């Protein structure tokens, strides 16, 4: 197999073979779209039990004209990188097989996001391969770049957790928050979060026009947020009438005085040089604060804030496309870092305006 760890100019010229396991869903389709336009990746296999034998373009319209076809996931060819876009529980059961055929595994499910078996017992239904948990690296280069470089197992973050963590991280990194402060997180997310299979609550007649609390407490992404920021949060999630997007409004109550200058210093210090984070903090015009519509189809995250001195509160906003920055785009970005490729390769699209409901 090709060595996927070269750096510099050679890395930008090399071809990296890749398979996508579970490529028939929405996230799998986004991943295939990105890899098909990537200057380095060569897709050799796309699997789906339910769609085996069908052309990829018949399921994912952006890939019409591609000669790729879905295959059964049982007999896989050796590749440099294996992307797993499967439901929770699949990757942990097949992780040994994945590493038999690939040097690097990028898992987009929840199977390796948490650090300990005890966390999976608490938040999920246990874990079949706990020995891999300490080997996995969380797929957010903005705050985990050093550890992702050369990583063999990459764990994609949850979309709601990604939006929340990117919004709050600078406050901890720059000492505005130290842990223990009250943080209330309110996330609104589009219907694509439920996947292509959906369900009764995701059907158009039931979903259209809603602002529906579906996880007032106990959302599993809360575990990721608390793990990464090392603090507790009060987290609530709403299903809303859009297809793409996750918007997090974070109400933060710091223990000491904070100025707008402090906030700008923190956020610029963390994100000024990041290619996929842009600030939207007040100003003028229609798009004054982060919103999913402005980043639909991109790997961008928008972050902004307002200070509420009378209530001793900071309101932090963050917005992403849940299928891109919250999943497929994040996975490709992390893979670029792990393999020493150009970070922005395959992810340069900056969005459209105007657009309809994302």
Go through each PLM region and give its residues.
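N-terminal Rossmann-like NAD(P) cofactor-binding subdomain of oxidoreductases
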Residues: 1-207, 212-214, 306-309, 344-358
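Conserved active-site and cofactor/substrate-binding residues in soluble primary-metabolism enzymes
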Residues: 26, 135, 159-166, 216-224, ...
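Alpha-helical scaffold segments in soluble metabolic enzymes
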Residues: 30, 34, 166-170, 224-228, ...
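Generic secondary-structure signature for well-ordered alpha-helical cores
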Residues: 36-40, 173-177, 219, 227-231, ...
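Short, solvent-exposed beta-strand edge segments and adjacent coil->beta transition regions
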Residues: 151, 245-249, 313-315
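Short Gly/Pro-enriched turn/cap motifs at secondary-structure boundaries
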Residues: 213-217, 238-241, 291-295
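Oxyanion-binding "anion nests"
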Residues: 218-243, 247-249
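C-terminal active-site/capping subdomain that shapes the small-molecule cofactor and substrate pocket
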Residues: 251-358
